[in-house]
Amino acid sequence: MFTTVQPTNRSSLPDDLFTAIKELKRELNAVILAHYYQNSDIQDIADYIGDSLGLSQQAARTPADVIVFAGVHFMAETAKILNPDKLVLLPDLDAGCSLADSCHPEDFARFKAQYPDHIVISYINCSAEIKAMSDIICTSSNAVKIVNQIPAHQPIIFAPDRNLGRYVSQQTGRDLVLWQGSCIVHETFSERKIIELKVAHPEAKIIAHPECEASVLRHADYIGSTTALLNYSLKSSEKTFIVATEPGIIHQMQKSAPEKLFIPAPALNNCACNECPYMRLNTLEKLYLCMRDKTPEITISEDLRVKALLPIQRMLEMS
């Protein structure tokens, strides 16, 4: 669960937020973890930038006393599950996740009860309550690897992302029972507009996140997690890429390979719908305020934390 108190006293912000945040980080012995989908200025001040797997691994081993999570609430909650004695802060408590919200604990409990012989592998983009009902957690980086380690005779429920589940099923040859959840960002990409971009840039490689719909993935030259997409684009000899995931990742791509062209995949409508509205709620100002005021703090009951911890630990062991 989350506190409901937002940072107060937003006046008198320092002129140099970067310097002020660095000073607070030293005072608090804090680490700033940021997802690739965060605004570029937050990425630039973070101690570690990564995908869900990398951020979980960093959270599990950080010596810092305070974890400032520039991401969405299930990520900060995961950090708290792994670090019950540390102060975990989230700049904006409204930074939720459409995918996590698509899987309500009561509904999932009824769904799970229909398949008593199945184990549950849940994508990390879910609440602590869903994690507690799971046997193993996975990320887009390791989902295929984890499913491949499950004995062939063992049936599997995969939740909550149907698109990632479908992709994992295709890659592993396993029949998975899928929860029908999805990410609003990765389902907004337009197949037609991506094809039009490819026609305009025939030399471009299409790279896509497996949360995208099958209609988009079938055009992709490479499919992978955000970290995998970044690494592929940097190692490839190609110079132009159409990027079908949240465009925040392009900041790191451009920093690492300024000579290359990265084109964000367009949405169905003429809007900024390919940007995650929840990730973008975090700002440099809110990052400073949450560190200054030490709130909003992420809290979770010990009983729920212990239940949610085990499947996360299994993931880290199997990765």
UniProtKB/Swiss-Prot annotation:
The keyword Lyase does not apply. It comes from Microcystis aeruginosa (strain NIES-843 / IAM M-2473). Its EC number is 2.5.1.72. GO terms for cellular component: cytosol. Belongs to the quinolinate synthase family. Type 2 subfamily. It is an enzyme of class 2 (transferase). It comes from the Bacteria. Catalyzes the condensation of iminoaspartate with dihydroxyacetone phosphate to form quinolinate. This is Quinolinate synthase. InterPro entries: NadA, NadA_sf, Quinolinate_synth_type2. It catalyses: iminosuccinate + dihydroxyacetone phosphate = quinolinate + phosphate + 2 H2O + H(+).
